Amino acid sequence: MTTQLEQAWELAKQRFAAVGIDVEEALRQLDRLPVSMHCWQGDDVAGFENPEGSLTGGIQATGNYPGKARNATELRADLEKALSLIPGPKRLNLHAIYLESDTPVARDQIKPEHFKNWVAWAKAHKLGLDFNPSCFSHPLSADGFTLAHADDNIRQFWIDHCKASRRVSAYFGEQLGTPSVMNIWIPDGMKDITVDRLAPRQRLLEALDEVISEKFDPAHHIDAVESKLFGIGAESYTVGSNEFYMGYAASRQTALCLDAGHFHPTEVISDKISAAMLYVPRLLLHVSRPVRWDSDHVVLLDDETQAIASEIVRHNLFDRVHIGLDFFDASINRIAAWVIGTRNMKKALLRALLEPTDQLRQLEASGDYTARLALLEEQKSLPWQAVWEMYCQRHDTPTGSQWLESVRAYEKEILSKRR
């Protein structure tokens, strides 16, 4: 530890103690908040089922930065590099298309054995795993419908895929000793004016009920459902709307997934957390950065990321909110994208933990909104960066932008050789 870092740390402890904050306790609390990193940033959502196939479902990964992972070995190596540069607890979020098999496997036939390498790797790196059925980039999703499909056979195929995915998810939780959160997102919707908006939603309701009919130990598996406003090619109607899934999660007591990019650009999920928590047992967050639409840009340490973190901490939702990331930028180094976004999420959580929330709540309750605003703004100037750097130091990860040198070296030695 450098003298400069030690001096900054001691000063930060004093400054935060002056406003009633124990920075050591804040760091202990930060270690209770894992962030689930998404595997699909590493290969632009290609997966291993058909890596040369096109990405469908109204989502896009734009850019052609060289060096993307082409197989599971490369993806795990890239993840290891990213994980080594991010302090504190992490998880990994997998999609079904990241299965490993010597022969083709239909999506309704996936089994735990197709993910045994991921489980062994997660054990070795002390990671929890989360999971997602992949209801896109497939011939039977080509017309834009899956679980809400009017064709009974196609709809049943996707039901069976989601049921098989739940068994994989439960296997993750059983093997790793931490519950896997399995999130269901489907692209189902229509491009133009839709006459019958009810029937697809009735089909989706019945399909989801069949999907979750098999009971699993909640210590191993947690169901989540995710809404969306629109997607490319489904601008006019989305079956799985916010109202649909809010009602479903509340009535079935599943987790509700809130994705930062899945609402109108003037809406923010930070404002939805406290409302949803009154009705659903758990929330899954997909922290992202929408630029004009659900563009899935890399997460910044911006106002909304901070507001999301503050909601979790202020209301002590540590055990009810699962923090995941969802972005995929193919225009920059993909390992750097993981590191930037995940470190930013953790920085936001730390800043929230360093807030004198009790004092601010008292000011608010007494009607002293002047002092509330003044202290909230002054809080931004306190030396949280020194606390962050100490956290990085204790977890043997680089402080500041030193991690970028490691990424550049890896790019030169490993990524540049991929063609």
From Swiss-Prot:
GO MF annotation list: L-rhamnose isomerase activity; manganese ion binding
Keyword Isomerase included in the entry's annotation: yes
Keywords on record: Cytoplasm, Isomerase, Manganese, Metal-binding, Rhamnose metabolism
Coiled-coil blocks: none
Segment forming the signal sequence: none
Cofactor: Mn(2+)
Catalytic function, reaction form: L-rhamnopyranose = L-rhamnulose
The protein's Enzyme Commission number: 5.3.1.14
GO cellular component terms, semicolon-separated: cytoplasm
GO biological process: L-lyxose metabolic process; rhamnose catabolic process
Cofactor note: Binds 1 Mn(2+) ion per subunit.
Pfam families listed in its UniProt record: RhaA (PF06134)
Subcellular localization(s) per the UniProt record: Cytoplasm
Superkingdom field: Bacteria
Enzyme class at the top of the EC tree: isomerase
Pathway: Carbohydrate degradation; L-rhamnose degradation; glycerone phosphate from L-rhamnose: step 1/3
Binding site for Mn(2+): 262, 294, 296
Keyword field contains Signal: no
Record's subunit section: Homotetramer.
Function summary: Catalyzes the interconversion of L-rhamnose and L-rhamnulose.
Family indicated by similarity: Belongs to the rhamnose isomerase family.
PANTHER family: L-RHAMNOSE ISOMERASE (PTHR30268:SF0)
Protein name listed in UniProt: L-rhamnose isomerase
Source organism (scientific name): Salmonella arizonae (strain ATCC BAA-731 / CDC346-86 / RSK2980)
Gene, per the UniProt record: rhaA
